[in-house]
């Protein structure tokens, strides 16, 4: 778990990375950050960076698995969310003052070992994110997606299957389902105060 200070640093790192990349096409130097990164940023963690504008998704890309140092994963995900999400045109530099930056730190995904019909009761909406995999198809939805769109666990499973390019009932027909948890830090407004979000009790 990250502390509030570390969570604020994660979001600031993501924003600073996007600003630096869009203005100068380079990563920010440590001395340019204006804050210190604690040792947790050297640990391997999964992470996603989400960008929204006026409440609408503007980009979301990340590392589902802990394959990189957290600092590197945040910077890579931030650039990718801003410039490489195929669903959206690249973010422009003049848009940044309208965009809210959100960083989700992920736990290691774990396969849910249960009969398909029992999967919905194993999923806690607001706490768990999902990965559905079948063959070469794979889709991921973050923990905050289900409560934000008022999904129950069955709907959440179906939408994760759709994200993977599968039929919504693929989870009932042999697709592998894994879950993970996420610690979410988000700007209250563009460039504003960073708060930790918690959906699990809502």
Curated annotation (Swiss-Prot):
**Annotated signal sequence range:** none
Domain of life per record? Archaea
Q: Which PROSITE patterns match?
A: AMMECR1
Entry coiled-coil feature ranges? none
Which parts of the sequence belong to the AMMECR1 domain?
A: 5-196
Read off the HAMAP family from this record. AMMECR1 (MF_00645)
How is this protein named in the record? Protein Mbar_A1807
């Amino acid at each position: 778990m990250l502390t509030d200070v570390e969570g604020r640093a994660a979001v600031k790192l993501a924003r600073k990375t996007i600003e630096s990349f869009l203005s100068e096409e380079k990563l920010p130097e440590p001395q340019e950050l204006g804050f210190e990164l604690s040792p947790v940023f050297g640990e391997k963690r999964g992470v996603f960076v989400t960008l929204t504008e006026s409440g609408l998704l503007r980009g979301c890309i990340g590392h589902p698995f802990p394959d990189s140092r957290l600092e590197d994963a945040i910077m890579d995900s931030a650039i990718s969310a801003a410039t490489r999400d195929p669903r959206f045109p690249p973010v422009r530099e003049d848009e940044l003052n309208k965009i809210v930056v959100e960083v989700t730190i992920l736990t290691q995904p774990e396969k849910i070992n249960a009969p398909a019909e029992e999967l919905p009761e194993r999923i806690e909406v607001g706490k768990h994110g999902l990965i559905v995999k079948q063959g070469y198809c794979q889709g991921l939805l973050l923990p905050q997606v289900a409560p934000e769109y008022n999904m129950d666990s069955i709907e959440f499973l179906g939408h994760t299957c759709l994200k993977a390019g599968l039929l919504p009932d693929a989870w009932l027909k042999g697709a592998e389902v894994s879950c993970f948890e996420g610690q979410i830090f988000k700007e209250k407004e563009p460039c504003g105060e960073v708060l930790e979000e918690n959906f699990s009790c809502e």
